[in-house]
């Protein structure tokens, strides 16, 4: 089994509350690269146990479940379907810096039984996806 991680960060010129308000609306992710729509799956709308289905412009869909939630600090989620992986856990965290900026970090760990080449291609894809999505988010402030 192949396993690896991807971690991307960006500093955004905003305050912590505004950034948390933006990223914690887990179905309002217009900054997510290639996202067409996102909807809730179930009654819970935030916090541990909330579920969402992200539909992408290429027709793919990814179902994610929130498994960690600390307001104004982080949320963690797992993908349960839609990715070419056997395991995927990610955390998006924010940290207040001096000078009214906030550092946002998107980090994930994943594993797959795919071939080494397929796995390496996915790592490149995911790294670019995180970087572009965070750039999109930064551009909204």
Residue ranges and their predicted role:
Residues 1-11, 17, 95-103, 128-131, ...:
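Hydrophobic-ligand-binding modules of eukaryotic lipid transfer/binding families
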Residues 6-8, 50-52, 64, 90, ...:
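Hydrophobic residues positioned within well-ordered beta-strands of beta-sheet architectures
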Residues 56-101, 109-111:
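Hydrophobic-ligand binding "helix-grip"
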Residues 109-141:
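A conserved amphipathic terminal alpha-helix motif
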């Amino acid at each position: 089994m192949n396993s690896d991680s991807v971690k991307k960060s960006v500093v955004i010129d905003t305050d912590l509350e505004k950034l948390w308000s933006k990223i914690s609306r887990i179905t309002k992710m217009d900054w997510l690269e290639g996202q067409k729509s996102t909807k809730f799956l179930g009654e819970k709308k935030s916090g541990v146990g909330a579920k969402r289905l992200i539909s992408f412009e290429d027709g793919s869909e990814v179902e994610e479940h929130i498994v960690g939630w600390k307001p104004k600090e982080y949320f963690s989620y797992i993908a349960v379907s839609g990715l070419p992986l056997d395991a995927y856990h990610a955390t998006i965290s924010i940290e207040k810096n001096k000078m009214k900026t906030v550092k946002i970090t998107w980090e994930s760990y994943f594993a797959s039984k795919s071939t080494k080449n397929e796995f390496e291609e996915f790592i490149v894809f995911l790294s670019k996806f995180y970087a572009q999505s965070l750039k999109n988010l930064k551009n909204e402030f």
